[in-house]
From Swiss-Prot:
GO terms for cellular component: periplasmic space. This is High-affinity zinc uptake system protein AztC. The D-loop is required for the efficient acquisition of Zn(2+) from chaperone AztD. Monomer.
Length: 309
């Protein structure tokens, strides 16, 4: 009797241990910034353990890696990156970490846009900081491109975890359905606006893919610094363009300094109409805590500001 009970107990323990071991080994995934992290979570679900390097409301262009980031990469199975020179820190971080993880570039397959000036500016502490790059990296700002990101993530996860491939593909298909509905929603919101009232001003040139997909024109103070001698003339030139194009609103961005935009708003006689989310999500309690919420917030804020003029 005791032997029988012992065998049952032993089998139960071994079975439980095997199941626990199977469930205790999720795919270790590193995503470079918050938007990609959200895509990864949607596709991976509970089969992945996710580490996001650049968090909400943070600028990936100027991010300085920490020792913990190298440790995360060293233990990763998959690293998800935007590519197009968006993550300037990543090459040296990969080298420092010694990781042998698969690196998936999520813009592969996207029809990318060239940077007209060989790069674009960010505004940090009132100064214009140039980010060089041959192609505009902000491809996620058009929802059809986000679908490519999601497909690439599913492919990367399937390559690293064949047993979970069906789950990854099902998650991706379900999420792509949500993205299709979002794309339709944004197109309808912008289509309701008059053609001559579709221009806004933003802090940096991060919305060209949104512009091409949805028909809103974005102006930005490229290269203007609040501390430069040429700032007054540059701002005056931008204000002339704002008036010529009948721009109706100025938006701050969650990752950019607002001082220059406040100056432009005063001189152009336009309101600061709110905040758009360009290169990072908001925190969990903000209006852009995931990609769909971010795009819905941006499109809604733009449509409301332009309709009110």
């Amino acid at each position: 009797m005791k032997d029988w009970l012992f065998r049952i107990a032993t089998c139960s323990i071994m079975t439980f241990s095997s199941l626990a071991a199977a469930q205790a080994e999720p795919l270790d995934v590193v995503a470079t910034f918050s938007i990609i992290g959200d895509f990864a979570a949607k596709v991976g679900g509970d089969r992945i353990r996710l580490n996001v390097l650049v968090g909400p409301d943070s600028d990936t262009h100027v991010y300085e890696p920490r020792p913990a980031d190298a440790i995360a990469l060293a233990g990763a199975d998959v690293v998800l990156t935007n590519g197009l020179e968006f993550e300037g820190f990543l090459t040296r971080l990969i080298a420092a970490s010694g990781t042998d993880a698969a690196v998936a570039t999520l813009t592969d397959g996207v029809e990318t846009m060239e940077e007209p000036g060989g790069g674009h500016y960010h505004y940090i502490d009132g100064k214009a900081v140039f980010h060089a790059g041959a192609h505009d990296p902000h491809a996620w700002q058009a929802v059809p491109n986000a679908k490519v990101y999601v497909q690439n993530i599913a492919a990367a996860f399937c390559a690293a975890d064949a047993e979970g491939c069906a789950a990854y593909q099902a998650n991706a298909a379900r999420y792509i359905g949500e993205l299709d509905a979002l794309d339709t929603e944004i197109r309808a919101a912008i289509a309701a606006l008059p053609q001559d009232r579709r221009t806004v001003v933003v802090a940096h040139n991060a919305f060209r893919y949104f512009e091409a997909a949805y028909g809103v024109h974005f102006l930005s103070p490229q290269g203007v610094s609040t501390e430069s001698e040429a700032a007054a003339a540059d701002v005056a030139g931008l204000i002339r363009e704002i008036r010529a194009r009948n721009a109706s609103a100025i938006f701050a961005e969650n990752i950019s300094d607002t001082r220059l935009l406040e100056q432009i708003a005063r001189e152009a006689g336009l309101p600061l109409a709110g905040t758009l989310y360009s290169d990072a999500l908001s925190g969990p309690d903000g209006p852009a805590s995931n990609y769909i919420a971010m795009m819905r917030h941006n499109a809604g804020a733009i449509a409301a500001a332009l309709a009110a003029r």
